[in-house]
Structures are given as C-alpha cells and as structure tokens.
C-alpha cells in the first residue's frame, strides 16, 4: 500500500503538562474533532479514551503514554498523551525522545506549575519545539496574561500570545486571532459552530498592542523580518506565519494559545497551530547514530528511500496480542513479517504484525514508513531505547536515559502459588518500565521493588494484583540510599589459600578516586608488563562491581567511584578468576578505611503552595525536615515555597500539611539530586541496617 500522507503532512506531537492541567481532556477533544471518536469521554467521570488502564480511569490521571493517530486538515497527526505526574517521568522522557513537537498544556489559573517545569526542562534537553495551550479559561480565577507571565518568569521562555481570550471564567465565549485580527465566537456547546467576526470594540486596543508585540518578538528571531520591521514596512500575515513557524521549529519562540477543552473552545484553533507551527519529520535535523561495525557516526535522513531505522520507545503487555513494542520510524520502510536487526542487543528479530494504535484499540497495517509511530507484535528481545535497523545498514541510535529509582519497598507473596506468579508479573512490569527495578536480597530472600515515587510503586503493585492476580503483602516505603567515596586512596587486596586441594592466589593494587556525580563506576586498567595477566583483568572489574552492589558502610549500592588497577602479582598455578575477584573485593574493603566513605540520600525539589497565613508553618516544616528554601513567590492569596528536602523526611508530609492549612495546602515533589547525609543521620542509618 502506498504512503497515505507525505512526510511534509505528518506531525508527531506530544501533549505534556502538570497533573490536572486538563491534558487528557484536551487530547480527547482532539480525537473528537478529528473524527476519531463520536462521543466525548470526561476524565473526571472515568470515561476517557486515552486513559485506558483501570487505574488511570479510577485515579483520573494518565500513567502510560498512549499513542494514537488522528487526521486534521489533510495531515496525519500522531499524538502521544504523556503523564503529568512526576513519578512517571520516564514516560514523558521516552515520548519526548521520539516526538518532533509538543503542546504544553497549562491550567490558566495556575500558569506554570512544578511538573510543567520538569517536562519543559526535559523538552528543552531533547530540543523539542513547543506551542503552549492555556487551558481551563472557563475556570474561576482563570487569567491568561498571568499564565503567559509565568512562562517568562519561571521558564525564561520567549513565549508570546498569538491569541487573546474574549471574556474569562463563566463569560469565556471566544478567541481573538492576533494574526488574522478576527474574533472567533462559539455559538454552541460542542464548539463546532464558530462565527468569525470583527474584534469587539472593547478588545481592539489590547489586540493591536499584543499583535505589535508579537510582530516585534518574531522579527527579533529573523534578520529579514527585522529589517522590514525597523524600516516601518508592513509585515504580511503570510510572512508572520512563516516567521513564527521558523522560530518555533528552531526552539527560539513559543506561540501561546488559549481555550477550554472541557467547554469545547479553542481546540480546533490549537490543531490549526499544530499544523502551522510544529515541524514535520523533514523540518528537524536527521537523527544521528553509530555504526556498530566501524564506530563511525552516521545520519539517517527522514526518507522512505533510506535504509530502515527505528527506535523502540515503549513495551506494553496487551491482554489480547501479548507483548507490544512501540517504535518510531526515522527512515526507510518496514513490512510486517520482515526481519530487522536489534543493533543495541546484536540480535535479529522478526516483526510479526504491525499495529496502528488508537488509545487501546488497534488497526492492523502491512507497512510503516519514515516518520510513522506504530506498535509491533512478536519482538522477543527488544526493550525500551533499543535501535531496530535494516540488517544490511546497521546503526545504533542515541538511546533513552533512564533515571535511577529513589524509593523502594518490600513485597511478599501471600502463598506459594502467588510466589510463582509474582516472579512472572514483576519481570513483565520491569520490561515495560525501565525505572522500575526488582531485586532479591540474597541474605533474607526478600523481594524488593524500587521506583520513582510512592504513586509509581502503588500503581505497579495494583497492576500486579489486578492484571496478574497476585496477592501480596507490601512493606512500608523506604529510601534508596547510595554510598560513595569522598577521598582518593590506594589499597591492596591480597588473597591466598594454599591448604588442601587447589590453591588460590590473587594480588591487586587499586587506586580509588571519587567520580563526578551521575558518572557511576568507571574502571581503568593501568597494568604494565603483565604483572596481572590480561585474562584476569575482567575478573578484577567484576569483583569490584559485585562488591559495590553492597556498599562498605550500610550495604547500599556504591556509585560515582573510579578504580584504577595499577599493580599486583600472580601465581602460575594457583591464580584464577575467582581469586582475583576476591582480591578486588578485599581491596575495596581496605580502601574504605581511608577513602572517607559517605552515604548519599535523594534530595527532592519540593514545591509547597499554602495560604499566606500559613507561610510560617511551611517554613518551619522545611527547616524541621533538614530542608533548605530555594525561593518563594506570591500567587493571589497563596505563597509558593520551593525547597530542597531529603526524601527520607517527606513521608507522611501530606497529612502534616493538610492539618496545618485546614486542607488548603498542596505540595509536589520531584527527585533532583543525591547529597551526603549529615554524620549523625549516617550513624543512625548504619545502626538501623546492622539491626542494632
């Protein structure tokens, strides 16, 4: 089957926002107006099309990024609905990795909120062009210009309105288009009848001022427009649209639109803006990768003529078809039934069926083309972030960075039958979600699961019970501490056993130095003259990695340490891999005596919103929890406090804040970085882990 939509008429977009900004409702309306659904489902009634997991419909939040395909104005729009809750950051990250553009949805009463900042930062890292939709203009307290101001103040974004609202709250009845300089008035509840009129007299002056500011802001991003503007020549609508498109695609400018998805206003105009201003796969730089055979950098331009290259960005288990692998095609064409090379794993995979997804319903297709997003059935070894390419033109595309989990809890099956099912369930859930880790404590046999936050683990335990019918007892959440060295040292590890049977002999000298935060463990072989034979070097590295899994102070994993093996000796007969592994672990223990080992704890960026009268209480809460205030700002009658607080001190804080503010205070937290725990706390942690 020939390609239905050209690359120029394809848009791959994400919808991203803070939790509760109305993102899923916005996506629902897009599906409604593009003819994908015939009845609108409200999130707060638990009937949304995109939120298809039971937990999502119950909680009214989006957990997994559902992918769907819609058509608008002769274009194909592939939409990924991403979660707004911070515990599901990986879902946002992996969608951004495969998108070409995004719509950031704001609650126009609150403007930029904490999770908006997180997803905005991630989108900036991936260089994703964005338009902004200030939603909920019908809500009490809605303030469009305040929302625009928060984009400047909190995100330092060069964002400018290309629309203005007519009225607000209950009186929100239409939108002024600052490019056409016309008013769009809504005359029915479904938002399908729109009258285009002249701008009402009382809004004309504000509209003219805003248009002038818009032209100036766009002209600043383009030399030719700037010359015309400075010489007083008129900039035509076509030139303005082209200028906005170019600046938006270059991530130099962010158009801001307004509306109310719930009240069916502004969504079609936002779809027009997606087509007008967000890039097609042809507008963005060709994806780069590395040839696994030559290590040379290669590009894959968006074209059906190029060799096939795609990135797997999500794994899901579907009750009807089994394991689904979502992938984005960057170049080339793929037919169902063909073979591809998973270059990340070095394995050949067969594509069974190819499905085009619409939330949780699906349509089988024969072929996918460059720029498409689809799901494949039948891939056995592919996981999130793997590259799938033509067997004759291999390339490894840049993968998806996975954040480390910060919170863990113990799960215990209720019966022997549950134990077997639990192993399978946890393995499948971990395949779907790379931020979810499962470990078994070797000494106690307990199963420990780790994730990005309490809600994250709640949802996964819930899925284990519902989807896999596993009954389990769940322990209290615990912090995922880490350990590291704060000083450099040299240490010897010497292991010798020569009594009875085959002897063992391993002798190493290793220099340990602190590594940069986030760099993890790095091993360097600096052996000269074969004092440690080459075949035993991997055993030394393996011995260190295994020992570092249970750190020297309290048994927490060690991170950010460099180890340089620079000397040692061996025995012709008695030396073995095992002996050198043990010698390496002894060197690590020895190093701990002088390398200033430290325990690290996850620090959360906490944003607390509370009535002004309770500001003193909130500041007290932060200080009492070993936190430090990073900034404050007033918003109406509330104060917003941003602070860094250890995760260990945040358990149960929701209850404390609720009672201090009579239920009017709220907080959000997102993992920010790891930091040394104070000495007194370190001693307590060590005592606790040793059961003293």
Swiss-Prot record:
Gene3D superfamilies: 3.30.230.10, 3.30.70.240, Elongation Factor G (Translational Gtpase), domain 3 (3.30.70.870), P-loop containing nucleotide triphosphate hydrolases (3.40.50.300), Translation factors (2.40.30.10). GO terms for cellular component: cytoplasm. InterPro entries: EFG_II, EFG_III, EFG_III/V, EFG_IV, EFG_V, EFG_V-like, EFTu-like_2, G_TR_CS. GO terms for molecular function: GTP binding; GTPase activity; translation elongation factor activity. The keyword Hydrolase does not apply. CDD domains: EF-G, EFG_III, EFG_mtEFG1_IV, EFG_mtEFG_C, EFG_mtEFG_II. It comes from the Bacteria. Keywords: Cytoplasm, Elongation factor, GTP-binding, Nucleotide-binding, Protein biosynthesis. Residues 8-282 form the tr-type G domain. Its main location: cytoplasm. GTP binds at residues 17-24, 81-85, 135-138. It holds the Pfam family GTP_EFTU_D2. It is found in: Cytoplasm. GO terms for biological process: ribosome disassembly. Catalyzes the GTP-dependent ribosomal translocation step during translation elongation. During this step, the ribosome changes from the pre-translocational (PRE) to the post-translocational (POST) state as the newly formed A-site-bound peptidyl-tRNA and P-site-bound deacylated tRNA move to the P and E sites, respectively. Catalyzes the coordinated movement of the two tRNA molecules, the mRNA and conformational changes in the ribosome. PANTHER family: RIBOSOME-RELEASING FACTOR 2, MITOCHONDRIAL, TRANSLATION ELONGATION FACTOR G-RELATED. Belongs to the TRAFAC class translation factor GTPase superfamily. Classic translation factor GTPase family. EF-G/EF-2 subfamily. This is Elongation factor G. It comes from Streptococcus pyogenes serotype M49 (strain NZ131). The gene is fusA.
């Amino acid at each position: 089957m020939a390609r239905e939509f050209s690359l120029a008429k394809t848009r791959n977009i994400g919808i991203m926002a803070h939790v509760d900004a109305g993102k899923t409702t916005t996506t629902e309306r897009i599906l409604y107006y593009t003819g994908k659904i015939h009845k609108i489902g409200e999130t707060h009634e638990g009937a949304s099309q995109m939120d298809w997991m039971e937990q999502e419909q119950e909680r009214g939040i989006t957990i997994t990024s559902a992918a769907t395909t819609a058509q608008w104005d002769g274009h194909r729009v592939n939409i990924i609905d991403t979660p707004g809750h911070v515990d599901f950051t990986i879902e946002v990250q992996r969608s951004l990795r495969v998108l070409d553009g995004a719509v950031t949805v704001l609650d126009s009463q609150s403007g930029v909120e904490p999770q908006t900042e997180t997803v905005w930062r991630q989108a900036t890292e991936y260089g994703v062009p964005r338009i902004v939709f200030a939603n909920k203009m019908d809500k009490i307290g809605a303030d469009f210009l305040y929302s625009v101001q928060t984009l400047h103040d909190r995100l330092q974004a060069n964002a400018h309105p290309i629309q203005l609202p007519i009225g607000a709250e209950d009186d929100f009845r239409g939108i002024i288009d600052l490019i056409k300089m016309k008013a769009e008035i809504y005359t029915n509840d479904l938002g399908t009848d729109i009258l285009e009129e002249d701008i009402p007299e009382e809004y004309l002056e504000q509209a003219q001022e805003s248009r002038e500011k818009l032209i100036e802001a766009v002209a600043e991003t383009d030399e030719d427009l700037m010359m015309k503007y400075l010489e007083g020549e008129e900039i035509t609508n076509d030139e303005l649209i082209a200028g906005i498109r170019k600046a938006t695609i270059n991530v130099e400018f962010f158009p801001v639109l307004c509306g109310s998805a719930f009240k069916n206003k502004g969504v079609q105009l936002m779809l027009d803006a997606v087509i007008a201003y967000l890039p097609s796969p042809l507008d963005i730089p060709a994806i780069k990768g590395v040839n696994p055979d030559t290590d040379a950098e290669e590009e894959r331009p968006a074209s059906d003529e190029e060799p096939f290259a795609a990135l797997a960005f999500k794994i899901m288990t579907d009750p009807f078809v089994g394991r689904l692998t979502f992938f984005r095609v960057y170049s080339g064409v793929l037919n169902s039934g063909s073979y591809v090379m998973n270059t990340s794993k070095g394995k050949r995979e067969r594509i069974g069926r190819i499905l085009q997804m619409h939330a949780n319903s699906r349509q089988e297709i024969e072929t996918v083309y460059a720029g498409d997003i689809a799901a494949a059935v039948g891939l056995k070894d592919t996981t999130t972030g793997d590259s799938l390419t033509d067997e004759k033109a291999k390339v490894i595309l840049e993968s998806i960075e996975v954040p480390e989990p910060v919170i863990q809890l113990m799960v215990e099956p209720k019966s022997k039958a549950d134990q077997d099912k639990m192993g399978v369930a946890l393995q499948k859930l971990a395949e779907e979600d790379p931020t979810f880790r499962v470990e078994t404590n070797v000494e106690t046999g307990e199963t420990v699961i780790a994730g990005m936050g309490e809600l994250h683990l709640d949802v996964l335990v819930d899925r284990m019970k519902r989807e896999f019918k596993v009954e389990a007892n769940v322990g209290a959440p615990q912090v995922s501490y880490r350990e590291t060295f704060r000083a450099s040292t040299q240490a010897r590890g010497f292991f010798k056993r020569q009594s009875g049977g085959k002897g063992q002999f391993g002798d190493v000298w290793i220099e340990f130095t602190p590594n940069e935060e986030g760099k993890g463990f790095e091993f360097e072989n600096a052996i000269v003259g074969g004092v440690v034979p080459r075949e035993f070097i991997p055993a030394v590295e393996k011995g260190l990695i295994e020992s570092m899994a249970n750190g020297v102070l309290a048994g927490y994993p060690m991170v950010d340490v460099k180890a340089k093996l620079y000397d040692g000796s061996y025995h012709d007969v008695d030396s073995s891999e095992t002996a050198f592994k043990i010698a390496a672990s002894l060197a690590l223990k020895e190093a701990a005596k002088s390398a200033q080992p430290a325990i690290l704890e996850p620090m959360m960026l906490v944003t607390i919103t509370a009535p002004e009268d309770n500001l003193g209480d909130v500041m007290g809460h932060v200080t009492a929890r070993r936190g430090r205030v990073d900034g404050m700002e007033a918003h109406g009658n509330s104060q917003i406090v941003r602070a860094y607080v250890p995760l260990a001190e945040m358990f149960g804080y929701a209850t404390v804040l609720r009672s201090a503010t009579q239920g009017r205070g709220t907080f959000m937290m997102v993992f920010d970085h790891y930091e040394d725990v104070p000495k007194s706390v370190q001693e307590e942690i060590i005592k606790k882990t040793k059961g003293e």
